[in-house]
């Protein structure tokens, strides 16, 4: 049995090594998520249901300012606290830039992909941000990398949380194979947000 002080150190270590700013975790909890609109309440209900029902994939899509990052980080840290599981945060744009730069460096590329594929919980934030070419298609290098991550995590039954300013319908239109796979994996654990009421007042969900 782990004593409270040991448990606290383990959780702190997991969160500090996740890639997400540690000081933000205390602010981005489920308890701190504001629920003054029906949409906010629906987001929080989805998060609680995903945790309670031990879901594998969750997606929060739609407008900037809707509190997508807050609710997703809240879910991730709740899973860490419950199961002491490994967790990685992937800021899509910066992580994809690194992965593309390592394509011809097998060791660095493999190490980074291994971390993203094998971690118990992965949160991909701002999915597909700035990822379209002039024709409106997903850049092929990024599409291949993303599909590898999605497929390998599916095969390993790893918990994966996604947030994006694009809707699920828009992602399917960008690439039907990738979008359809994501939609299938997310199933009932997805929500589209408008964000229209979120950052107008003094308090906000980040």
How should each PLM-predicted stretch be described?
Residues 125-127:
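Walker B catalytic acidic pair
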Residues 85, 118-121, 156-162:
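Loop/turn-to-beta-strand initiation segments
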Residues 55-73:
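Walker A/P-loop nucleotide-binding motif
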Residues 70-84:
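P-loop NTPase Walker A phosphate-binding motif
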Residues 32-58:
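Pre-Walker A (pre-P-loop) alpha-helix and adjacent loop at the N terminus of AAA/AAA+ ATPase modules
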Residues 1-41, 190, 201-206:
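A short, basic N-terminal segment
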Residues 41-44, 80-118:
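Short glycine-rich substrate-engagement loop in P-loop NTPases that contacts/grips substrate
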């Amino acid at each position: 049995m782990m004593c409270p002080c040991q448990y606290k150190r383990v959780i702190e270590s997991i969160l500090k090594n996740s890639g997400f700013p540690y000081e933000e975790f205390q602010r981005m909890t489920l308890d701190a998520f504001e629920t003054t609109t029906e949409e906010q309440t629906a987001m929080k209900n989805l998060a609680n249901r995903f945790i309670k029902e031990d879901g594998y994939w969750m997606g929060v899509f739609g407008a900037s300012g809707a509190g997508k990052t807050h609710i997703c980080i809240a879910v991730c840290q709740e899973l860490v606290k419950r199961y002491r599981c490994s967790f990685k945060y992937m800021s899509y744009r910066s992580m994809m830039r690194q992965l593309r730069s390592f394509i011809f460096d097998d060791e660095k590329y493999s190490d980074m992909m291994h971390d993203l594929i094998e971690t118990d919980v992965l949160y991909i934030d701002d999915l597909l941000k700035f990822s379209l070419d002039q024709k409106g298609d997903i850049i092929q290098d990024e599409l291949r990398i993303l599909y590898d991550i999605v497929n390998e995590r599916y095969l390993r039954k790893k918990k994966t949380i996604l947030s994006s300013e694009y809707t699920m319908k828009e992602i399917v239109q960008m690439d039907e194979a990738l979008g359809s796979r994501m939609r299938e994996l997310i199933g009932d654990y997805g929500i589209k947000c408008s964000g229209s009421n979120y950052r107008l007042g003094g308090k906000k969900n980040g």
